[in-house]
Amino acid sequence: MKLLKKKGINILALAVLAFMIFVRLTSYGDLNLSVANADTETYIKGGAAPLFSKDMLTKSRLFTTNLFYYLADAQGCEIQTVSYPALRTETYRAIQPCFDRIVFFQNILSIIAWSLLSLAVTKRLSGGYEKLLAVSLITAFGFTPAIADWDSILGSESLTFSLFAISLALIIEVCFNFARENNKRTTFTHILAMVALVFWAFTRDANIYTLAVLFAVSIISYFVFPAVRKTKKLLVLITAIFLVTVVGLQSAMTSGRWATPMTNVFNDLILPHPARVEFMQTLGMPDPASAEYSTWFNENAPRAYARFLLAHPGYTLTSFTSELDGIFSENIQPYFYSEQTPARVALMAANDVLHPKTHLIFILDILLMAGLLFSLFRRKNINFTLWVGLEIWLFLSASATMAVGFFADSIGLTRHTMFAVEMFRLMMWVFLIVLFDQSNRKDEFQIS
């Protein structure tokens, strides 16, 4: 009877997933509809680099988007529908020859990604209601406009969201299978996880910091838990993550992609303030009007700005906290309009619930993580420990990504921090479900 009940729950969960996919496929119009933005041309130019050349890593865009637009053969394609929200020229999507296959792929990849993540979480839950809740909420999270609308935009955001969902799903599998040393499927999962992480890391420079946090959490786990040290495959994966992190950071610095946003920071936040200029001068900054300034800036600006933030913790903290409301104030893309069909109205209502526009999400995540850590000392089963480890990694990663997005540019803060905001929103739903599920578990397997 128990087996039949379990199979029944799994079948029902798959039925819910199938329904959610149907809604996603039928509620957003033609999957070939697209709109370009101010950055689209740079992605097309990035894809013009020869395959696997140095330019694939060191141009103005990153390897994944360069490779994506290279394979899409978008060079020479004419952009017909473009939106500039800053100029109030938002428009409706259109089918653009050449770019239709790009957004079609983005849509399909997104559907697969969020479906995989929902199944990965559902698989590791024990309660039937929690399984149904997970498959419903996680797919709805990825299929509502805050995420799904980006699949029609010719940029890096869609790939960032989708590859993150795939990476997270595979990391969950790796974590819960780490003891199966000789399992061939586990080896394949490790390889897939590393490939997904590499492609995801090289969609945006800020993603590299998430990998750095993953490496740090993995190293700590390696030394704390003997069971982890016994797993050679995990050590290989940790080493690979470290190497990708180093390559990513080196790529970001040598490419000069940081120069434009850092120029905005200096022009808006440093140079207009005499006291801040004086501090920078103690670090060797010459007169901004001098010929030497450009050389100093190219060699020292990121490091000097980081030292400024560390030396002024009050400014760093207050400048961030004062903008929290604004950072969490959006849950919809600004580039195109959509017809207000009944389906769209319903999706927007769900969107506002699943992607709340309040910085209280950040505070709730802190409280949720504190609650999970407190519960860990009282309930030491291996599954719960793994979930808490994932929560810590995601929280620290989202915090690092948000800090980089916030402080690395003075323009477009909402867009630059959008991915971190969505990570915080997703964490709240996933780990609330995990907490509900763990509170009903009866097993207490200890970590050895």
Language model region names:
Residues D100-G128, I166, L170:
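Transmembrane-helix motifs of polytopic, lipid-linked glycan transferases
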Residues I102-F105, T139-I171, T203-T210, T417-F419:
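Multi-pass, polyprenyl lipid-linked donor-dependent membrane glycosyltransferases
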Residues L159-A179, A193-L197, L214-F215, M427:
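Specific aromatic-rich, kink-prone transmembrane helix
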Residues F188-R204, A240-T245:
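Membrane-interface alpha helices of multi-pass inner-membrane proteins
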Residues Q250-T341:
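Membrane-proximal stem/loop segments at transmembrane-domain junctions that anchor or position
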